[in-house]
Amino acid sequence: MICVSVQEKSFGDCRAILESCEMAELRADLCRLSVEEVERLVEIRPNLIATCRIANSSEAFAREQLEAAIRRGARYVDIEIEAPDEHLEYIRTLAREYGCRLIVSFHDFEGTPSLDELKGIARLCRTKGADLVKIVTTARN
């Protein structure tokens, strides 16, 4: 299965992509959709990962977008490991209540940590309540 990252600016473009794929990551922080539009997109493709990075938006905006996706039936929600604990706790609790699986993710756009560091990161993600751990690193050679 291929997961498509949806980052389009218009609802219509997002909808067209979601209707043509098996699974998608809806980047609400990059799409800038209304809550109602997020809800409608989740109805089209519930088998998606709802993502809204605080670094690209605000905690309040991220909470609003993720809450809408979870309540409407998104299968997964992705929270970055650096998110404030109270934000992560709120989203984790809501996700559990609605049967949504929590992905806690780590990103390193500069390189790849050592294997021991990666194992430690995975453990930390699990202690934060992750159902799934996502680690993204950057290869340099």
Regions found by a protein language model. Name each.
Residues 1-3, 23-25, 47-51, 75-78, ...:
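Structural preference for beta-strand elements that scaffold enzyme active sites
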Residues 1-63, 71:
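Conserved N-terminal beta1-alpha1 strand-loop-helix module at the mouth
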Residues 14-15, 38, 66, 88, ...:
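Generic hydrophobic/aromatic pocket-lining and core-packing "Φ" positions
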Residues 20-22, 63-79, 119-134:
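Structural recognition of alpha->loop->beta junctions
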Residues 28-30, 81, 137:
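Residues that line or immediately flank small-molecule/substrate-binding pockets and catalytic motifs
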Residues 41-42, 69, 95, 125:
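A generic structural signal for well-ordered alpha-helical segments
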Residues 57-64, 113-119:
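Glycine-rich, charge-decorated loop segments at or immediately adjacent to ligand/cofactor-binding or catalytic sites
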Residues 83-141:
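Catalytic alpha/beta core domains of metabolic enzymes, predominantly
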